[in-house]
Amino acid sequence: MVDYLALLSSQNPYDRLDGWFKIDWLIQNNIVTKEKLIEMKDKFLDLLSYNDDTVKLHAWRMVPQLINKGIITVKDVKKYDFLSLLYDSEAWLLVKDLVNSGVIDIESVKKEKEKYIALLKGNELDRIASWSLILDIVNLGIIDKNDVENNKKYLLELFNFPAYDIRFNLLFLVAELISKGVLSPKELEPYEKKIEEIVKDKDFNQFVKIYEKDPRELESIGIHVFNS
């Protein structure tokens, strides 16, 4: 039988993360009480400043949930540094929820905008991740429409990237950005042949299943003519 109290305070940070990730289940099944979790909250909070950024990112992802559950408070978290993680696209995925939770100050995040802009033109994975957040980041006032316009080329040039999985995911991301008004269909015109190659590729249907995509998303923006 798993000793969940030991898991919540494990010396292994990934085991400890796993324990705290299960708090809803632990409470619902009367394995650990909310009061006991509050007593043990320092075991979670220590992960926010762990000497491994991957551990820290996983812990910060849980912060809004633990605040909503009343297990930790905004005051508990304020003493820890999140902003230093913003070199990583995974950290930007958390910004909106952390701002809305009152944990981080939007004005402080705005000072880090160049880190986000660097990701918009960084490696292929960072570009896909950061562009998927673009509307949230604009709506938070961290970057403006000029920043978007000045960096679109770095997203679109991924249509020339050799790896098919990148081009496949790029196509669906671009379709989403067009539907939301971030990009226009006209901006895709230079890449029509590349788009056709993606959709006609022998692996297209397999990737649709793997990534749980709906090809109708492509039809809705007028590129269904390339559907095989």
Swiss-Prot record:
Regulation: induction: Aerobically induced.
Protein name: Uncharacterized protein in sor 5'region
